[in-house]
Amino acid sequence: MKRSSRGFTVAELVMVTALVAILASVAVPTARFTMKREREAELRLDLRLMRNAIDDYKRLADQGMIQVEVGTEGYPKTLEELAEGVPIVGQLTKRKFLRRIPIDPMTGKAEWGLRSYQDEMNSDSWGGQDVYDVYSLSGGTALDGTKYKDW
């Protein structure tokens, strides 16, 4: 009597399961690394956009195109001012420097650490006079070992 066997043996199932587990153990850390690298690239871009907007505002203030209070350094008072727009001397419309305040990809919030021109370099507290620099409020560490707040 000939018996035809259909299906898989237990050994075959164990081998396939082990192979899938090995592949998954390699794929998950690689995916996490890739996602973190993408968020870091987005953070760099967002910081660059905001810093360029601050620099553009300062340049126009120094040229007298934006009215600033006497005794101030010519930087915006808030990030919101960059997104809402400011009146330009001799023009009817406001000039916007940012479309919107970006969301920090590390914290998931549109909240950023701020430094004013009068603050100490690398200070973690904002004096509130103006916005001279921005940084991430994330306490995390980047792939290169630096802290996000130091970027």
Give a label for each model feature:
Residues 2-31:
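N-terminal single-pass transmembrane signal-anchor helix
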